[in-house]
From Swiss-Prot:
Protein name: Glycerol-3-phosphate acyltransferase
Gene: plsY
Domain of life: Bacteria
GO annotations of cellular component type: plasma membrane
Pathway, per record: Lipid metabolism; phospholipid metabolism
Length: 191
């Protein structure tokens, strides 16, 4: 029964669509009508309001940190259930007919909550890739791939969860992958 409560509460926290809420409140617009139509931080940056984009990023990270850290310290056996549920809440929010974001910021919150070093592996990989390419999507894919790769190569740690997360992030970026392949992907300005 506890795992159901963990899963549901983590999903509900993860499903709070901060990009949608913030653009509605501060810009009086629907973020789904802007840029890629995605509710996440990268598309929030495309609104032209960097503060709104960074606020979305921080809130999307936080909505994963809260349930995952709580579960980590109170129900550690369910940490991956909480993590996956928060991620799925962001990607498939009940409030927006299950059409959410791509889950990268939420995944960053998950990583830092599980192990700060894994969060750093992602951030460093993301930053290096972004500095070279200027593609947020490619950076997100590389960052999410580097976490299980790091665990496989350098740690004696079960990387199955992180491989699953990479596959899910790849899935949420499938259109970006097509655009990258066709050299049609839009570069991202983060500053």
């Amino acid at each position: 029964m506890e795992y159901l409560i963990v899963a549901l509460s983590s999903y509900l926290l993860g499903s709070i669509p901060f990009g949608f809420i913030l653009t509605k409140i501060f810009l009086k617009k629907d973020i789904r009508d802007i840029g890629s139509g995605n509710i996440g931080a990268t598309n929030a940056l495309r609104t032209g309001n960097k503060t709104l984009g960074y606020a979305t990023l921080l809130l999307d990270i936080t909505k994963a940190v809260l349930p995952v850290l709580y579960v980590k310290f109170n129900y550690p056996d369910y940490i991956f259930i909480a993590s996956l549920s928060a991620f799925l809440g962001h990607v498939f929010p009940i409030w927006l007919k299950f059409k959410g974001g791509k889950g990268v910021a939420t995944y960053v919150g998950i990583l830092f909550s599980i192990n700060i070093f894994l969060g750093l592996v992602f951030i460093i990989s993301w930053a290096v890739t972004f500095l070279i390419s200027k593609y947020s999507s490619l950076s997100s894919l590389v960052g999410s791939l580097m976490v299980p790769m790091y665990l496989i190569v350098f740690e004696n740690y079960n990387s199955i969860f992180f491989i699953i997360m990479f596959v899910l992030i790849f899935y949420t970026h499938r259109e970006n992958v097509k655009r990258l392949k066709n050299k049609e992907e839009t570069k991202t300005k983060i500053y």
